[in-house]
From Swiss-Prot:
It comes from Rickettsia prowazekii (strain Madrid E). One of its GO terms (biological process) is chromosome condensation. InterPro entries: Hist_DNA-bd, IHF-like_DNA-bd_dom_sf. The keyword DNA-binding applies. One of its GO terms (cellular component) is cytosol. The lineage of its organism: Bacteria, Pseudomonadati, Pseudomonadota, Alphaproteobacteria, Rickettsiales. Disulfide bonds: none annotated. PANTHER family: DNA-BINDING PROTEIN HU (PTHR33175), DNA-BINDING PROTEIN HU-BETA (PTHR33175:SF3). This is DNA-binding protein HU-like. Transmembrane segments: none annotated. The keyword Transferase does not apply. Keywords: DNA condensation, DNA-binding.
Length: 80
């Protein structure tokens, strides 16, 4: 499973000229921006990774609605 700490470690391995704290702050900023964008009902498109958006869903037993994150991956994500 990929966690935030795992992601920070991998980015730090690739960009070893940055301190781990700088990488952590960068990852936190990116995730915060993505989170805020979804809260504002904005669509997020990351080329060659996928699209994220908010969809309204209805509870089956009631007329109440809730928001859920919808992810659509590109067709070529798992092609070699």
């Amino acid at each position: 499973m990929v966690t935030k700490n795992y992601l920070i470690d991998k980015v730090h391995d690739k960009l070893d000229y940055l301190s781990k704290q700088d990488v952590k702050e960068s990852v936190d900023l990116i995730l915060d921006y993505l989170n805020e964008s979804l809260k504002e009902q904005k669509r997020i498109e990351i080329r060659n990774f996928g699209n994220f958006s908010i969809r309204k869903r209805k509870f089956p037993e009631s007329n109440k609605f809730y928001n859920t994150v919808y992810y659509r991956m590109p067709k070529n994500l798992f092609k070699d």
